[in-house]
Protein backbone atom coordinates (compact mmCIF):
# COMPACT_ATOMS: atom_id res chain seq x y z
CA UNK A 1 0.00 0.00 0.00
CA UNK A 2 1.58 3.30 -1.09
CA UNK A 3 0.27 6.82 -0.67
CA UNK A 4 2.06 9.85 -2.06
CA UNK A 5 1.14 13.24 -0.64
CA UNK A 6 2.82 16.49 -1.60
CA UNK A 7 3.14 18.89 1.31
CA UNK A 8 2.91 21.85 -1.04
CA UNK A 9 -0.80 21.09 -1.37
CA UNK A 10 -1.30 22.43 2.15
CA UNK A 11 -0.18 25.87 1.10
CA UNK A 12 2.76 26.42 3.46
CA UNK A 13 5.45 28.07 1.37
CA UNK A 14 8.21 27.32 3.89
CA UNK A 15 7.53 23.62 3.79
CA UNK A 16 9.76 21.59 1.46
CA UNK A 17 8.13 19.32 -1.08
CA UNK A 18 7.85 15.85 0.41
CA UNK A 19 6.25 12.76 -1.07
CA UNK A 20 4.73 10.41 1.50
CA UNK A 21 4.50 6.64 1.17
CA UNK A 22 2.79 4.09 3.38
CA UNK A 23 4.98 0.98 3.47
CA UNK A 24 4.19 -2.38 5.06
CA UNK A 25 7.18 -3.92 6.79
CA UNK A 26 7.34 -6.92 4.45
CA UNK A 27 7.54 -4.54 1.47
CA UNK A 28 10.87 -3.08 2.62
CA UNK A 29 14.01 -4.42 0.98
CA UNK A 30 17.52 -4.49 2.42
CA UNK A 31 18.38 -1.14 0.83
CA UNK A 32 15.35 0.43 2.54
CA UNK A 33 16.49 -0.78 5.96
CA UNK A 34 20.04 0.47 5.34
CA UNK A 35 18.73 3.91 4.35
CA UNK A 36 16.32 4.05 7.29
CA UNK A 37 19.05 3.00 9.72
CA UNK A 38 21.28 5.84 8.58
CA UNK A 39 18.36 8.27 8.75
CA UNK A 40 17.56 7.30 12.35
CA UNK A 41 21.19 7.54 13.47
CA UNK A 42 21.43 11.06 12.06
CA UNK A 43 18.02 12.07 13.45
CA UNK A 44 18.42 10.62 16.95
CA UNK A 45 22.17 11.23 17.25
CA UNK A 46 21.88 14.93 18.18
CA UNK A 47 19.69 13.93 21.17
CA UNK A 48 22.44 11.66 22.51
CA UNK A 49 24.63 8.83 21.27
CA UNK A 50 22.66 6.34 23.38
CA UNK A 51 19.47 7.16 21.45
CA UNK A 52 21.15 6.43 18.12
CA UNK A 53 22.76 3.18 19.29
CA UNK A 54 19.76 0.87 18.56
CA UNK A 55 20.06 1.72 14.87
CA UNK A 56 23.57 0.35 14.40
CA UNK A 57 24.21 -2.56 12.03
CA UNK A 58 21.51 -1.47 9.57
CA UNK A 59 18.71 -1.93 12.10
CA UNK A 60 15.69 0.27 11.29
CA UNK A 61 13.76 -0.13 14.55
CA UNK A 62 14.62 0.42 18.22
CA UNK A 63 12.23 -1.66 20.33
CA UNK A 64 9.14 -3.37 18.96
CA UNK A 65 9.19 -3.62 15.18
CA UNK A 66 6.50 -1.68 13.30
CA UNK A 67 4.17 -3.40 10.86
CA UNK A 68 3.54 -0.31 8.74
CA UNK A 69 5.45 2.92 8.27
CA UNK A 70 4.74 6.34 6.84
CA UNK A 71 7.93 7.60 5.21
CA UNK A 72 8.42 11.05 3.70
CA UNK A 73 10.93 11.49 0.88
CA UNK A 74 12.39 14.62 -0.68
CA UNK A 75 15.21 15.28 -3.13
CA UNK A 76 17.80 14.38 -0.46
CA UNK A 77 16.25 11.06 0.55
CA UNK A 78 14.26 10.23 3.68
CA UNK A 79 12.88 13.37 5.30
CA UNK A 80 10.58 12.03 8.03
CA UNK A 81 9.20 8.79 9.44
CA UNK A 82 6.58 7.41 11.80
CA UNK A 83 5.79 3.75 12.52
CA UNK A 84 2.65 1.92 13.60
CA UNK A 85 2.06 -1.40 15.35
CA UNK A 86 -1.28 -2.94 16.27
CA UNK A 87 -1.13 -4.42 19.77
CA UNK A 88 -3.15 -5.01 22.92
CA UNK A 89 -2.28 -2.87 25.92
CA UNK A 90 -3.78 -2.98 29.38
CA UNK A 91 -5.25 0.30 30.64
CA UNK A 92 -5.97 -0.24 34.31
CA UNK A 93 -7.78 -3.59 34.20
CA UNK A 94 -9.01 -3.29 30.60
CA UNK A 95 -7.34 -5.00 27.63
CA UNK A 96 -7.51 -2.65 24.66
CA UNK A 97 -6.55 -2.94 21.00
CA UNK A 98 -4.64 0.12 19.78
CA UNK A 99 -2.49 1.21 16.90
CA UNK A 100 0.69 2.31 18.65
CA UNK A 101 2.60 5.15 17.00
CA UNK A 102 6.35 5.50 17.43
CA UNK A 103 9.71 5.79 15.69
CA UNK A 104 8.87 9.40 14.95
CA UNK A 105 11.73 11.36 13.44
CA UNK A 106 12.42 14.32 11.16
CA UNK A 107 15.74 14.92 9.44
CA UNK A 108 17.69 17.50 11.47
CA UNK A 109 17.96 20.01 8.61
CA UNK A 110 14.15 20.13 8.35
CA UNK A 111 13.37 20.72 12.03
CA UNK A 112 11.18 23.78 12.51
CA UNK A 113 9.92 23.92 8.93
CA UNK A 114 6.49 22.51 9.74
CA UNK A 115 7.05 19.21 7.95
CA UNK A 116 5.79 17.26 10.97
CA UNK A 117 2.24 18.41 10.21
CA UNK A 118 2.23 16.00 7.28
CA UNK A 119 2.46 13.10 9.72
CA UNK A 120 -1.32 13.39 9.72
CA UNK A 121 -1.19 11.13 6.67
CA UNK A 122 -1.04 8.31 9.25
CA UNK A 123 -4.53 9.21 10.46
CA UNK A 124 -6.41 7.65 7.50
CA UNK A 125 -4.17 4.57 7.83
CA UNK A 126 -5.47 4.10 11.38
CA UNK A 127 -9.02 4.37 10.04
CA UNK A 128 -8.30 1.82 7.33
CA UNK A 129 -6.96 -0.63 9.92
CA UNK A 130 -10.10 -0.14 12.01
CA UNK A 131 -8.39 0.11 15.40
CA UNK A 132 -10.43 1.68 18.23
CA UNK A 133 -7.66 4.12 19.14
CA UNK A 134 -4.26 5.34 18.11
CA UNK A 135 -1.86 5.40 21.05
CA UNK A 136 1.60 6.71 21.80
CA UNK A 137 3.75 8.36 24.43
CA UNK A 138 5.53 11.68 24.08
CA UNK A 139 8.00 13.61 26.17
CA UNK A 140 6.60 16.61 28.09
CA UNK A 141 8.89 18.86 26.07
CA UNK A 142 6.83 18.01 22.96
CA UNK A 143 3.44 18.83 24.50
CA UNK A 144 3.03 22.16 22.70
CA UNK A 145 4.23 20.71 19.42
CA UNK A 146 1.82 17.76 19.51
CA UNK A 147 -1.05 20.01 20.58
CA UNK A 148 -0.37 22.27 17.61
CA UNK A 149 -0.01 19.34 15.21
CA UNK A 150 -3.01 17.22 16.23
CA UNK A 151 -4.83 18.53 19.27
CA UNK A 152 -6.17 21.75 17.82
CA UNK A 153 -7.67 19.85 14.89
CA UNK A 154 -9.46 17.53 17.31
CA UNK A 155 -7.52 14.52 16.03
CA UNK A 156 -5.98 13.61 19.37
CA UNK A 157 -5.84 14.27 23.09
CA UNK A 158 -2.89 14.28 25.47
CA UNK A 159 -3.41 12.63 28.86
CA UNK A 160 -1.14 13.27 31.85
CA UNK A 161 -0.69 11.59 35.22
CA UNK A 162 -0.35 8.11 33.70
CA UNK A 163 2.51 5.68 34.26
CA UNK A 164 3.42 3.48 31.29
CA UNK A 165 5.21 0.17 31.84
CA UNK A 166 7.18 -1.54 29.08
CA UNK A 167 9.65 -4.38 28.74
CA UNK A 168 13.18 -3.76 27.50
CA UNK A 169 13.80 -4.86 23.91
CA UNK A 170 16.61 -7.11 25.15
CA UNK A 171 17.54 -8.87 28.40
CA UNK A 172 20.16 -7.04 30.47
CA UNK A 173 21.76 -8.69 33.48
CA UNK A 174 22.17 -5.35 35.26
CA UNK A 175 18.62 -4.05 34.69
CA UNK A 176 15.09 -5.05 35.72
CA UNK A 177 13.04 -6.74 33.01
CA UNK A 178 10.60 -3.81 32.81
CA UNK A 179 10.76 -0.03 33.01
CA UNK A 180 8.11 2.55 33.89
CA UNK A 181 7.85 6.06 32.49
CA UNK A 182 5.84 9.11 33.48
CA UNK A 183 5.08 10.33 29.97
CA UNK A 184 2.27 12.15 28.27
CA UNK A 185 -0.09 9.66 26.64
CA UNK A 186 -1.32 10.49 23.15
CA UNK A 187 -4.77 9.10 22.29
CA UNK A 188 -6.35 9.35 18.84
CA UNK A 189 -10.02 8.32 18.75
CA UNK A 190 -10.54 6.28 15.57
CA UNK A 191 -13.44 3.79 15.71
CA UNK A 192 -14.41 4.71 19.28
CA UNK A 193 -14.83 8.13 20.91
CA UNK A 194 -12.37 9.64 23.35
CA UNK A 195 -14.98 9.22 26.08
CA UNK A 196 -14.67 5.44 25.67
CA UNK A 197 -10.96 5.42 26.55
CA UNK A 198 -10.70 3.39 29.79
CA UNK A 199 -9.87 5.14 33.03
CA UNK A 200 -6.66 4.11 34.73
CA UNK A 201 -3.40 5.59 35.94
CA UNK A 202 -1.24 2.68 34.73
CA UNK A 203 -0.82 1.40 31.17
CA UNK A 204 1.02 -1.86 30.56
CA UNK A 205 2.37 -2.46 27.07
CA UNK A 206 3.34 -6.05 27.89
CA UNK A 207 6.16 -5.58 25.42
CA UNK A 208 8.77 -3.06 24.34
CA UNK A 209 7.93 0.45 23.20
CA UNK A 210 7.66 0.95 19.45
From Swiss-Prot:
- Any keyword Transferase? yes
Identify this protein by name. Nodulation protein A
Q: What is its EC number?
A: 2.3.1.-
Q: What is its main location?
A: cytoplasm
Q: Where in the cell is it found?
A: Cytoplasm
Keyword terms = Acyltransferase, Cytoplasm, Nodulation, Transferase
Give the similarity note. Belongs to the NodA family.
Recorded GO molecular functions are: acyltransferase activity
Does the record bear Cytoplasm in its keywords?
yes
One Gene Ontology cellular component annotation? cytosol
Protein task: N-acyltransferase required for nodulation. Acts in the production of a small, heat-stable compound (Nod) that stimulates mitosis in various plant protoplasts.
Amino acid sequence: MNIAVSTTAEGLSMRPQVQWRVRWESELCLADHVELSEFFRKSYGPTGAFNAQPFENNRSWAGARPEVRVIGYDARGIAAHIGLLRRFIKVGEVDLLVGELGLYAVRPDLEGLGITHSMRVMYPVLHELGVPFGFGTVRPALEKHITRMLGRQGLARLLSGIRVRSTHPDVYLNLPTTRSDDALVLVLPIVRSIGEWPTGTVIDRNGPEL
